[in-house]
Amino acid sequence: MGGADKNRERALAATGDELTALLHHPDAEVLLALLDNPSLDEAQLCVLLERKSLPGEILEEVARRKPMLKNYRVKRGLAFHPRTPRLVTLRLLRELYLMDVVQLTLLPGIPTELKRSAEDQLISRLPQLPLGQKITLARRGPARLAGALLAEGHAQIIGIVLDNAYLTEAQVLRALSRERLPPGVVRSIAQHRKWSITYNVRLALVRHPSSPLATVLAYLPELTVSDLRELASPGIVPESLRKYLQAEVQRRIRAREKSAPGEDTAGPSAASNED
Protein backbone atom coordinates (compact mmCIF):
# COMPACT_ATOMS: atom_id res chain seq x y z
CA MET A 1 0.00 0.00 0.00
CA GLY A 2 1.43 3.39 -1.03
CA GLY A 3 1.87 6.38 1.25
CA ALA A 4 -1.21 8.15 -0.10
CA ASP A 5 -3.36 5.07 0.46
CA LYS A 6 -2.03 4.70 3.99
CA ASN A 7 -2.90 8.31 4.76
CA ARG A 8 -6.43 7.80 3.49
CA GLU A 9 -6.80 4.68 5.61
CA ARG A 10 -5.54 6.61 8.62
CA ALA A 11 -8.04 9.39 7.93
CA LEU A 12 -10.92 6.90 7.82
CA ALA A 13 -10.09 5.37 11.19
CA ALA A 14 -8.27 8.08 13.16
CA THR A 15 -9.51 9.26 16.53
CA GLY A 16 -8.48 11.80 19.14
CA ASP A 17 -5.28 13.76 18.58
CA GLU A 18 -4.45 11.89 15.37
CA LEU A 19 -7.76 12.93 13.84
CA THR A 20 -7.24 16.53 14.97
CA ALA A 21 -3.80 16.58 13.34
CA LEU A 22 -5.21 15.25 10.07
CA LEU A 23 -7.61 18.21 9.86
CA HIS A 24 -4.59 20.23 8.67
CA HIS A 25 -3.37 17.69 6.10
CA PRO A 26 -2.59 19.24 2.68
CA ASP A 27 -3.93 16.31 0.61
CA ALA A 28 -7.54 16.74 -0.53
CA GLU A 29 -7.99 12.95 -0.74
CA VAL A 30 -7.08 12.63 2.93
CA LEU A 31 -9.55 15.36 3.84
CA LEU A 32 -12.30 13.69 1.81
CA ALA A 33 -11.61 10.47 3.70
CA LEU A 34 -11.89 12.37 6.97
CA LEU A 35 -15.45 13.31 6.06
CA ASP A 36 -16.28 9.58 6.09
CA ASN A 37 -14.66 9.04 9.48
CA PRO A 38 -17.43 8.18 11.97
CA SER A 39 -15.40 9.81 14.77
CA LEU A 40 -15.40 13.23 13.07
CA ASP A 41 -17.65 15.49 15.12
CA GLU A 42 -19.16 18.91 14.39
CA ALA A 43 -16.51 20.80 16.35
CA GLN A 44 -13.72 19.17 14.34
CA LEU A 45 -15.58 19.79 11.10
CA CYS A 46 -15.81 23.48 12.03
CA VAL A 47 -12.03 23.53 12.60
CA LEU A 48 -11.61 22.10 9.11
CA LEU A 49 -13.89 24.79 7.65
CA GLU A 50 -11.74 27.49 9.26
CA ARG A 51 -8.92 26.64 6.84
CA LYS A 52 -9.01 29.47 4.30
CA SER A 53 -6.99 27.42 1.80
CA LEU A 54 -9.39 24.48 1.94
CA PRO A 55 -9.87 22.98 -1.56
CA GLY A 56 -13.21 23.74 -3.15
CA GLU A 57 -13.98 20.05 -3.63
CA ILE A 58 -14.02 19.59 0.17
CA LEU A 59 -16.47 22.44 0.57
CA GLU A 60 -18.69 21.06 -2.18
CA GLU A 61 -18.67 17.65 -0.52
CA VAL A 62 -19.65 19.10 2.86
CA ALA A 63 -22.48 21.01 1.15
CA ARG A 64 -23.77 17.78 -0.39
CA ARG A 65 -23.99 16.02 2.97
CA LYS A 66 -27.27 17.13 4.50
CA PRO A 67 -26.67 15.45 7.88
CA MET A 68 -23.60 17.65 8.34
CA LEU A 69 -25.61 20.78 7.57
CA LYS A 70 -28.02 20.09 10.41
CA ASN A 71 -25.42 21.67 12.68
CA TYR A 72 -25.72 25.47 12.50
CA ARG A 73 -22.01 26.14 13.13
CA VAL A 74 -21.12 23.91 10.19
CA LYS A 75 -23.70 25.64 8.00
CA ARG A 76 -22.37 29.06 8.99
CA GLY A 77 -18.74 28.05 8.49
CA LEU A 78 -19.54 26.81 5.01
CA ALA A 79 -21.48 29.96 4.08
CA PHE A 80 -18.66 32.22 5.29
CA HIS A 81 -15.82 30.33 3.61
CA PRO A 82 -14.33 32.39 0.75
CA ARG A 83 -13.97 29.31 -1.46
CA THR A 84 -17.49 27.97 -1.06
CA PRO A 85 -19.22 27.89 -4.46
CA ARG A 86 -21.51 30.89 -4.93
CA LEU A 87 -24.64 28.80 -5.51
CA VAL A 88 -24.05 26.92 -2.27
CA THR A 89 -23.75 30.14 -0.28
CA LEU A 90 -26.85 31.58 -1.94
CA ARG A 91 -28.79 28.50 -0.88
CA LEU A 92 -27.52 28.72 2.69
CA LEU A 93 -28.43 32.41 3.04
CA ARG A 94 -32.05 31.57 3.75
CA GLU A 95 -31.01 29.43 6.70
CA LEU A 96 -28.65 31.85 8.45
CA TYR A 97 -29.52 33.96 11.46
CA LEU A 98 -30.27 37.60 10.75
CA MET A 99 -27.06 39.07 12.16
CA ASP A 100 -24.96 36.42 10.43
CA VAL A 101 -26.42 37.54 7.11
CA VAL A 102 -25.50 41.12 8.07
CA GLN A 103 -21.95 40.04 8.89
CA LEU A 104 -21.72 38.18 5.60
CA THR A 105 -22.60 41.33 3.62
CA LEU A 106 -19.75 43.18 5.32
CA LEU A 107 -17.03 40.62 4.55
CA PRO A 108 -14.12 42.10 2.55
CA GLY A 109 -14.07 40.78 -0.98
CA ILE A 110 -17.56 39.30 -0.96
CA PRO A 111 -18.76 38.92 -4.58
CA THR A 112 -21.16 41.68 -5.62
CA GLU A 113 -23.95 39.30 -6.63
CA LEU A 114 -23.75 37.45 -3.33
CA LYS A 115 -23.70 40.65 -1.31
CA ARG A 116 -26.72 41.99 -3.16
CA SER A 117 -28.67 38.77 -2.62
CA ALA A 118 -27.89 38.87 1.09
CA GLU A 119 -28.97 42.52 1.28
CA ASP A 120 -32.18 41.73 -0.61
CA GLN A 121 -32.96 39.02 1.90
CA LEU A 122 -32.38 41.38 4.83
CA ILE A 123 -34.59 44.06 3.28
CA SER A 124 -37.35 41.53 2.63
CA ARG A 125 -37.30 40.58 6.33
CA LEU A 126 -37.70 44.15 7.60
CA PRO A 127 -41.53 44.26 7.76
CA GLN A 128 -41.57 41.27 10.14
CA LEU A 129 -38.79 42.44 12.47
CA PRO A 130 -39.43 43.90 15.93
CA LEU A 131 -38.21 47.43 16.63
CA GLY A 132 -35.27 46.24 18.74
CA GLN A 133 -33.78 44.26 15.87
CA LYS A 134 -34.34 47.14 13.48
CA ILE A 135 -32.40 49.43 15.82
CA THR A 136 -29.52 46.94 15.82
CA LEU A 137 -29.60 46.79 12.02
CA ALA A 138 -29.74 50.59 11.83
CA ARG A 139 -26.44 50.72 13.73
CA ARG A 140 -24.59 47.92 11.98
CA GLY A 141 -26.34 47.09 8.70
CA PRO A 142 -24.85 47.55 5.21
CA ALA A 143 -25.62 50.56 3.02
CA ARG A 144 -28.72 49.30 1.19
CA LEU A 145 -30.28 47.99 4.38
CA ALA A 146 -29.55 51.29 6.13
CA GLY A 147 -31.18 53.13 3.24
CA ALA A 148 -34.29 50.96 3.49
CA LEU A 149 -34.52 51.61 7.24
CA LEU A 150 -34.10 55.34 6.65
CA ALA A 151 -36.98 55.34 4.17
CA GLU A 152 -39.21 53.52 6.69
CA GLY A 153 -38.84 56.56 8.92
CA HIS A 154 -39.31 55.13 12.41
CA ALA A 155 -38.74 57.97 14.84
CA GLN A 156 -36.52 55.82 17.08
CA ILE A 157 -34.36 54.73 14.15
CA ILE A 158 -33.78 57.78 11.92
CA GLY A 159 -31.02 59.37 13.99
CA ILE A 160 -29.28 56.04 14.51
CA VAL A 161 -29.29 55.04 10.86
CA LEU A 162 -28.03 58.46 9.71
CA ASP A 163 -24.96 57.82 11.90
CA ASN A 164 -24.41 54.35 10.39
CA ALA A 165 -20.83 54.21 9.09
CA TYR A 166 -21.93 52.17 6.06
CA LEU A 167 -24.70 54.52 4.96
CA THR A 168 -23.75 56.15 1.66
CA GLU A 169 -24.74 59.38 -0.03
CA ALA A 170 -26.37 57.29 -2.77
CA GLN A 171 -28.72 55.70 -0.24
CA VAL A 172 -29.61 59.03 1.36
CA LEU A 173 -30.38 60.42 -2.09
CA ARG A 174 -32.44 57.33 -2.91
CA ALA A 175 -34.56 57.95 0.18
CA LEU A 176 -34.98 61.62 -0.71
CA SER A 177 -36.09 60.68 -4.22
CA ARG A 178 -39.33 59.40 -2.70
CA GLU A 179 -41.97 62.09 -2.60
CA ARG A 180 -43.83 60.40 0.23
CA LEU A 181 -41.52 60.17 3.20
CA PRO A 182 -42.33 60.41 6.90
CA PRO A 183 -41.75 64.10 7.78
CA GLY A 184 -39.13 63.19 10.35
CA VAL A 185 -36.83 61.75 7.68
CA VAL A 186 -36.46 64.98 5.71
CA ARG A 187 -36.13 67.07 8.84
CA SER A 188 -33.51 64.77 10.37
CA ILE A 189 -31.40 64.71 7.21
CA ALA A 190 -31.56 68.51 7.00
CA GLN A 191 -30.32 68.76 10.59
CA HIS A 192 -27.68 66.03 10.47
CA ARG A 193 -24.09 67.17 10.99
CA LYS A 194 -22.77 65.11 8.06
CA TRP A 195 -25.55 64.86 5.52
CA SER A 196 -26.82 68.43 5.85
CA ILE A 197 -23.53 69.81 4.50
CA THR A 198 -23.28 67.43 1.54
CA TYR A 199 -23.95 69.34 -1.68
CA ASN A 200 -25.98 66.69 -3.50
CA VAL A 201 -28.04 66.02 -0.38
CA ARG A 202 -28.79 69.73 -0.07
CA LEU A 203 -29.85 69.75 -3.70
CA ALA A 204 -32.18 66.82 -3.05
CA LEU A 205 -33.59 68.54 0.03
CA VAL A 206 -34.39 71.63 -2.03
CA ARG A 207 -36.27 69.41 -4.47
CA HIS A 208 -38.20 67.53 -1.80
CA PRO A 209 -41.75 68.80 -1.17
CA SER A 210 -41.51 68.10 2.58
CA SER A 211 -38.43 70.23 3.17
CA PRO A 212 -39.07 73.23 5.45
CA LEU A 213 -38.97 76.50 3.51
CA ALA A 214 -36.43 77.98 5.93
CA THR A 215 -34.06 75.08 5.23
CA VAL A 216 -34.46 75.44 1.47
CA LEU A 217 -33.86 79.20 1.53
CA ALA A 218 -30.72 78.72 3.62
CA TYR A 219 -29.31 76.37 0.97
CA LEU A 220 -30.00 78.53 -2.09
CA PRO A 221 -26.89 80.74 -1.77
CA GLU A 222 -24.75 77.58 -1.80
CA LEU A 223 -26.17 76.11 -5.01
CA THR A 224 -24.64 76.67 -8.42
CA VAL A 225 -26.46 78.89 -10.90
CA SER A 226 -26.92 75.95 -13.28
CA ASP A 227 -28.60 73.91 -10.54
CA LEU A 228 -30.77 76.86 -9.54
CA ARG A 229 -31.91 77.29 -13.13
CA GLU A 230 -32.72 73.61 -13.46
CA LEU A 231 -34.70 73.63 -10.22
CA ALA A 232 -36.57 76.73 -11.37
CA SER A 233 -37.80 74.96 -14.50
CA PRO A 234 -41.56 74.32 -14.54
CA GLY A 235 -42.69 71.21 -12.70
CA ILE A 236 -39.53 70.62 -10.65
CA VAL A 237 -40.53 72.34 -7.41
CA PRO A 238 -43.78 73.93 -6.20
CA GLU A 239 -44.63 77.29 -7.78
CA SER A 240 -44.36 78.92 -4.37
CA LEU A 241 -40.67 77.99 -4.28
CA ARG A 242 -39.86 78.83 -7.90
CA LYS A 243 -40.02 82.56 -7.22
CA TYR A 244 -37.28 82.24 -4.61
CA LEU A 245 -35.11 80.24 -6.99
CA GLN A 246 -35.62 82.75 -9.78
CA ALA A 247 -34.84 85.60 -7.41
CA GLU A 248 -31.60 83.89 -6.37
CA VAL A 249 -30.60 83.43 -10.01
CA GLN A 250 -31.22 87.13 -10.67
CA ARG A 251 -29.21 88.07 -7.59
CA ARG A 252 -26.28 86.00 -8.84
CA ILE A 253 -26.48 87.54 -12.31
CA ARG A 254 -26.44 91.05 -10.88
CA ALA A 255 -23.56 90.17 -8.59
CA ARG A 256 -21.62 88.67 -11.47
CA GLU A 257 -22.15 91.76 -13.61
CA LYS A 258 -20.69 93.87 -10.83
CA SER A 259 -17.71 91.58 -10.27
CA ALA A 260 -14.65 91.10 -12.42
CA PRO A 261 -15.13 88.76 -15.41
CA GLY A 262 -14.80 85.11 -14.43
CA GLU A 263 -15.08 85.72 -10.69
CA ASP A 264 -17.20 83.05 -8.97
CA THR A 265 -20.29 84.34 -7.19
CA ALA A 266 -21.54 81.04 -5.78
CA GLY A 267 -20.98 80.03 -2.17
CA PRO A 268 -17.74 78.26 -1.18
CA SER A 269 -19.28 74.78 -0.96
CA ALA A 270 -20.58 75.05 -4.51
CA ALA A 271 -17.43 76.47 -6.12
CA SER A 272 -16.29 73.13 -7.48
CA ASN A 273 -19.74 72.54 -8.98
CA GLU A 274 -20.16 75.92 -10.72
CA ASP A 275 -20.42 76.08 -14.49
Q: What is the role of each PLM region?
A:
Residues 1-275:
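Alpha-helical scaffold segments
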